[in-house]
Amino acid sequence: MIQVRVSGTKYRKARRSWFHLRRIGLRKDRYGAYTGELKGRRQVEKLKRYCEKKRLSFRIDNEYGRRGGSYRSIFFQTHAPAFGNYYFCAYCGRLLPKDRVTVDHLYPVGSASRDLKLQKKLKRHIRGINDPDNLIAACRACNQKKGTEMGRWIRRGKIGRHAWYWELRWSFRFALAAGVIFLAVWLIAVR
């Protein structure tokens, strides 16, 4: 289902576009948005180009663009804590108690509702935007920093969701620091 929403100063342009929107099968709902079902990627792409040309906002409404209300409880049912009642932030590795965890969508809901290529990719890998494989633990700062960005955040989230990664990283850092201290003490003792 494709929804074309009328917003602010673009209202006049949308009023002038009503004929074209009705011709392709969209109808005005009680909220002032044009809604309807479109079949096929070609028809959706054509509508997307038309909306961009006329400066209309639009949103693709499907299972990949809707945030469920229970995704936080789904996350805690399917993901065990790393230590006791603590989770790792998938982006920075900070240990967080369960009540401080912000459950984040690895692939953002907003991007999934607008991007057809991302929707196609998600259909191959996960069952929906609220699938447990798309949910990760994050601290509030990292979640706000990420926003709707993808790119490096996706890579960091996929690697950082595993507790062993942070344990290995911290062990390596500790070993490196211990090695540097040992080397410094040895150099002082040799003199």
Task: Name each region found by the language model.
Residues 109, 142-145:
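Phosphate/oxyanion-binding loops and surfaces in catalytic or ligand/nucleic-acid-binding neighborhoods
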Residues 45, 49-93, 122-129:
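Short, charged surface segments at domain edges that flank catalytic/cofactor-binding sites
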Residues 1-64, 150-191:
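Extended charged
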Residues 117-140, 165-186:
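Short Fe-S-cluster ligation motifs
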Residues 93, 140-143:
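Cys/His-coordinated zinc-binding microdomains
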Residues 88, 102, 138:
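The −1 position to Zn-ligating cysteines in a subset of zinc-ribbon hairpins
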Residues 93-135, 150-152, 157-159:
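Histidine-centered nuclease catalytic patch
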Residues 9-11, 84, 96:
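Short proline/glycine-enriched turn/loop motifs at strand-loop junctions of beta-rich domains
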